[in-house]
Amino acid sequence: GYKVTYFAIRGLAEPIXLLL
């Protein structure tokens, strides 16, 4: 399902973002 991909991307993108 796309939700798994969505949450995986969110989980990776949020800390990156915060670091940048």
From Swiss-Prot:
Every GST N-terminal domain range: 1-20
Keyword Thylakoid: no
Molecular functions per Gene Ontology: glutathione transferase activity
Keyword entries, A-Z: Transferase
Domain of life: Eukaryota
Annotated glutathione binding sites: 6
This enzyme's EC code(s): 2.5.1.18
Keyword GTP-binding: no
Catalytic activity, reaction form: RX + glutathione = an S-substituted glutathione + a halide anion + H(+)
Broad EC category: transferase
Function: Conjugation of reduced glutathione to a wide number of exogenous and endogenous hydrophobic electrophiles.
Family according to the record: Belongs to the GST superfamily. Sigma family.
Name of the protein this chain belongs to: Glutathione S-transferase 2
Natural source organism: Ascaris suum (Pig roundworm)
